[in-house]
Amino acid sequence: LGVDLAAAKPAAYRECGCGMGPALNIAASSNAYLLADRGTWLNFRNRGELAILVQGDKRMFNQYGVMVVNPARHPHVKQALAQQFADWVLSPAGQDAIASYRIGGEPVFFPNAGS
């Protein structure tokens, strides 16, 4: 992203070692910048003066995936059910369910199976 964190760290970079919700609270209370995922941001209500400055940048793409665990290595898994779930997630119905999930009317995820 063009930011040298090693150079910025002493004065400007802060790690909280916490989840995204608490990190948003810290940013709101200290007038800070924060990289946040869309779902947590949309669900977060204690925004104070926080506002989205950048969104949709391809360099921040955060893709989720689905995979079935190898039953030969993990015989306790319910492989058939896992495969059924994976097949559904990748199907048009699953992709529709993902696309239609909203928080406050805003989409949270952008399905791209088959892209």
Regions found by a protein language model. Name each.
Residues L1-S115:
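Exported/periplasmic ABC-transporter solute-binding proteins
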